[in-house]
Each structure stands twice: as structure tokens, then as C-alpha cells.
Amino acid sequence: MGQKVHPIGIRLGIVKEHTSVWYADGRTYADYLLADLNVREYLQDKLKSASVSRIDIHRPAQTARITIHTARPGIVIGKKGEDVEKLRQDLTKQMGVPVHINIEEIRKPELDGMLVAQSVAQQLERRVMFRRAMKRAVQNAMRIGAKGIKIQVSGRLGGAEIARTEWYREGRVPLHTLRADIDYATYEAHTTYGVIGVKVWIFKGEVIGGRQEELKPQAPAPRKKAAK
């Protein structure tokens, strides 16, 4: 059977950037790695309802700078900035260094792989038909301007006795093209029948000479005239 490399891992340093940026020697590397993992788990648990897509961690000179990419920044910031200040204090205590938190708003959540996967998983948990959930997400992404999108769900779909895999795709998703900007994400839907895995690939265009092609909404296909 064909084995597929992680779409983001193979593009690191080409069209994708690392989500943790710091330098450590052999003695502190494992400590930093574990600390980053704990920070991400803590933030994802605290900000479940904030539609968080990605958490970037930078460690410049005995400090930590954490950037939270979210579609709902108001929930993260809270009333008069109270929630984000409490997060900063908790993370400073947890990491042992001064922490600065930046909030980046995601203006097009329909084109973010993690947010699309979360949306499909939440619909599956509400017992929406998996085909309807996938088709709706694909149509929204193509309408906003994606060049291609593929969604795959695996598990006991519809409460079936035997688990299976179903997928839906529109447009192009060129996994072998390294300059292709492909957003890949996975998420789990916890249903009464068990766990259903959701995978999303979104092709946003090719990065040529360090500049990404401009995303434009797909024009609707011309209607064919009925024969008289």
C-alpha cells in the first residue's frame, strides 16, 4: 500500500514555517519541547470555544512570545482584556519566563484546515449526515476562493457496524508539488458510536518566488443552454 508523507512536514522551510521557533542545546531541548506541548494542550483546553487554529511559540532571550491564531479573537481577549491577561499570568507561571501573547484573527475560517475539520467534527457530533457536512464545507471553501479541497472521514459512519472511510473532493489538491500551499489538519469527532476521524486538505495556490498567487473566488460554471 502507498504511504503518504505529512503534507506540512515535507513543506517546512519551503512554503511552511515551524510553529515552534527557538534554539536549545542537548540538555534543554527535551524540556523546551515538553513545555511547548503542555502550553498547546493547556490553551486548546482553555479556548475550546474560540475556534483556535494554530499556536506559534517563539523564545527570544529568556522570554516567550505566543501567537494565537483564532477566528473569534473577542472570546480569547475577554471583557477589557481580562481573559488574555489571566492566560498570560498562568503561562508565565507555567513556563517560568515572562510571556507575551499576540492574537491573530483568521479572516477566512472557511480556508483554514483546522477550523474546517473542527466544524465537520462538531456537525458529526450533532448527528448531521456526514455527506451533508462534507459537501457544505467543500462548497464554502470553493466559494471563498480555494483552488481545491479534500475532506475524508473514517469510522462508524452513520452508526454502521463496520467502520469505513469516505471522502469528497473538489478542484485540485497536488500533494506532490512542493511549492503548493496546502493546509492539512486532522480532528476527532466523539460520537455515541465511537470516534470518527476527520482529515482536511485545502489547496490555496502555488508560492512562486516567495509570493503566493492571489486567491480569487471561483467563477460559477456557465450554464448549458437547453436544446430546442
From Swiss-Prot:
Family: Belongs to the universal ribosomal protein uS3 family.
SUPFAM superfamilies found in the cross-reference section: Prokaryotic type KH domain (KH-domain type II), Ribosomal protein S3 C-terminal domain
Gene Ontology biological-process annotations: translation
Function: Binds the lower part of the 30S subunit head. Binds mRNA in the 70S ribosome, positioning it for translation.
Subunit comment: Part of the 30S ribosomal subunit. Forms a tight complex with proteins S10 and S14.
Keywords associated with the record: Ribonucleoprotein, Ribosomal protein, RNA-binding, rRNA-binding
Protein name as catalogued: Small ribosomal subunit protein uS3
Lineage start: Bacteria, Pseudomonadati, Pseudomonadota, Gammaproteobacteria, Pseudomonadales
HAMAP family found in the cross-reference section: Ribosomal_uS3_B
Protein's UniProt keywords contain Isomerase: no
Protein biosynthesis among keywords: no
Record-linked NCBIfam families: rpsC_bact
Cellular component aspect of the GO annotation: cytosolic small ribosomal subunit
Pfam families from the UniProt entry: KH_2, Ribosomal_S3_C
Gene: rpsC
Residue stretches making up the KH type-2 domain: 39-107
Database matches in PROSITE patterns: KH_TYPE_2, RIBOSOMAL_S3
InterPro entries, sorted: KH_dom, KH_dom-like_a/b, KH_dom_type_2, KH_sf_prok-type, Ribosomal_S3_C_sf, Ribosomal_uS3_bac-typ, Ribosomal_uS3_C, Ribosomal_uS3_CS
Annotated source species: Pseudomonas fluorescens (strain ATCC BAA-477 / NRRL B-23932 / Pf-5)
GO molecular function: mRNA binding; rRNA binding; structural constituent of ribosome
CDD domains tied to this protein: KH-II_30S_S3
